[in-house]
């Protein structure tokens, strides 16, 4: 015979005596002598010498009188230390971690009841066993690109479940089926969903057996935003990737309106206070598939060496600070290149029109006019606004073919051969100076995809990297170094392109790797670090796997206002003056 359960009064109907409240406070105070201690409510209920309904009422009363129940199941002292942390994504819910922001500490796992997504900033409370999530501070990413995972047989139900495309977001989003438009193909389409603003921070997870795992997954209430694209379709995948990584494809109406008001060609008023260089035979040298041309070069020989002019598209003439064009460009930061298409930083009227140094038309530029001696040293430079007229849209393939004396290349470059030979001679001394200062020069291969007419990938090939590429690279280095020196001389705040020395731990790892191949090196401190690494790179050019190991030893280059030099290029100061059409910094 089963035991009959006694009926309990609702908590709101329980009458508490002052003695019971005092006794409960005494018990809790004893548990919280250490301000960092967190008492479990269920344990507190068990410790009360009274009926469970009374004990639950006492716990509620304590919450109202100063002791916080911040984590639903816990009591914390109101003065308990707090901090913040950021949730890191993972493939499985149990692998998600929190990285503390405002306190020292390593990553730690989340509590099973915390409902979080990667990127969430959470409040942390310190307990006797360490920091624990206590609440949501902010959720920077509410929108997720998802695919439907509800079984086909169950799609007639009221709710649909979706899983983010990202492999590092082990969550599920639940949407009312009536919110999803009928034209959305739940089998093939990726959609964008937004997590509800009132989604609870603490909630019970559900087991998602169809993931092939016995783990419990977090479910968030969400709303349908839009259809993104068809999965496994070339154009659809580009749209999906853009949405997944926050790449805006469409420009705002205000930006398009501002672009539309710009002239179709350079007008006479724009030429005021500009140097007229239209008589100089500037050329652009780019890849065959390039569509925007933001730099042009011209070189002439001098008694001491060469005069190099690098003309960069003057985007700032058309994109003024504070305009919608400027705000959209800031938001995008760069153009984003897909294998067969590009999402531009600027509207096409600018990126492929007014700001592109197309052949046969006048274009506004900012010119770096530099003198280089026969040791490859820049002895003088100046910057000024100018107007140029490109005399040729050349490709790396054609230029290299011409410089090798091949008939096809010579016919393609035509009368520009003289300028190209001068550029090549200048490149020779710049390349020698590069070796002299022990700049690091990795020989890496770049692969490119081959596409069918319908956008499907049909193969891959290795991009050729020849001296025509290197001519332009060295010319851009000259201009960028001059830009950095100019900013320093004028005491102007700017973003430098900086690259720090490798960390000692990574150098030690590299020593161990190379030792396995019978290669050793000795360091005497920072003074011989670059020469040693440069020689290692030279000695392993025929061993790509070792080149990769050396490359992974390097720190990542970044932009910052504090100049620390560029270790890889061995420059005391370096900035990016070039590529303004596709790069905002």
Residue ranges and their predicted role:
Residues 9-12, 198, 207-213, 230, ...:
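Electropositive polyanion-binding surfaces
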């Amino acid at each position: 015979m089963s035991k009959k359960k006694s009926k309990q009064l609702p908590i709101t109907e329980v009458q508490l005596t002052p003695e019971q409240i005092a006794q409960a406070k005494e018990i809790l105070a004893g548990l919280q002598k250490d301000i960092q201690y967190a008492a479990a409510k269920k344990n507190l209920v068990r410790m009360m010498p009274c009926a469970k309904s009374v004990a639950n009422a006492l716990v509620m009363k304590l919450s109202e009188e100063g002791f916080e129940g911040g984590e639903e199941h816990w009591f914390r002292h109101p003065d308990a230390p707090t901090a913040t942390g950021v949730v890191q994504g993972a493939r499985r819910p149990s692998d998600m971690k929190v990285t503390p922001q405002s306190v020292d500490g390593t990553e730690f796992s989340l509590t099973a009841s915390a409902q979080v997504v990667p990127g969430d900033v959470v409040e942390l409370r310190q307990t006797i066993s360490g920091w624990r999530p206590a609440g949501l501070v902010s959720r920077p990413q509410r929108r997720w690109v998802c695919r439907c995972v509800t079984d086909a047989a169950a799609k007639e139900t009221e709710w649909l479940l979706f899983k983010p495309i990202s492999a590092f977001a082990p969550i599920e989003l639940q949407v009312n089926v009536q919110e999803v438009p009928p034209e959305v193909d739940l089998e093939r389409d990726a959609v964008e969903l937004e997590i509800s603003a009132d989604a609870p921070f603490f909630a019970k997870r559900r087991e998602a057996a169809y993931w092939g795992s016995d783990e419990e997954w977090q479910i968030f209430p969400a709303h349908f935003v839009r259809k993104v694209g068809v999965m496994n379709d070339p154009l659809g995948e580009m749209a999906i990737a853009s949405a997944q990584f926050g790449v805006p494809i469409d420009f705002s109406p205000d930006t398009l309106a501002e672009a539309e008001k710009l002239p179709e060609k350079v007008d006479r008023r724009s030429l005021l206070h500009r140097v007229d260089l239209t008589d100089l035979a500037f050329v652009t040298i780019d890849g065959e598939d390039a569509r925007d041309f933001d730099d042009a070069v011209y070189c002439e020989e001098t008694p001491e060496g060469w005069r190099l002019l690098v003309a960069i598209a003057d985007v700032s003439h058309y994109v003024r600070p504070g305009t919608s064009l400027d705000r959209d460009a800031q938001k995008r930061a760069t153009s984003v290149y897909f294998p067969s298409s590009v999402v531009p930083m600027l509207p096409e009227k600018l990126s492929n029109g007014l700001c592109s140094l197309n052949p046969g038309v006048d274009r506004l530029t900012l010119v770096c006019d530099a003198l280089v001696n026969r040791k490859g040293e820049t002895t003088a430079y100046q910057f000024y606004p100018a107007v140029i007229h490109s005399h040729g849209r050349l490709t790396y393939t054609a230029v290299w073919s011409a410089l090798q004396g091949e008939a096809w290349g010579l016919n393609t470059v035509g009368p520009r051969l003289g300028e190209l030979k001068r550029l090549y001679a200048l490149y020779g001394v710049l390349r020698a100076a590069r070796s002299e200062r022990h700049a690091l020069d990795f020989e890496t291969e770049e692969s490119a995809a081959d596409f069918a007419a319908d956008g499907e990938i049909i193969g891959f090939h290795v991009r050729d990297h020849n001296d025509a590429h290197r001519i332009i690279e060295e010319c851009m280095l000259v201009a960028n170094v001059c830009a950095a020196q100019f900013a320093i001389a004028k005491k102007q705040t700017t973003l430098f392109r900086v690259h720090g020395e490798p960390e000692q731990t990574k150098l030690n790892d590299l020593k161990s790797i190379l030792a396995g191949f019978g290669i050793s090196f000795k360091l005497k401190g920072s003074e011989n670090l670059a020469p040693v690494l440069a020689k290692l790179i030279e000695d392993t050019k025929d061993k790509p796997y070792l080149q990769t190991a050396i490359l992974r030893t390097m720190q990542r280059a970044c932009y910052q206002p504090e100049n620390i030099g560029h270790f890889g290029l061995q420059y005391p100061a370096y900035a990016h003056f070039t590529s303004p059409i596709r790069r905002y910094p």
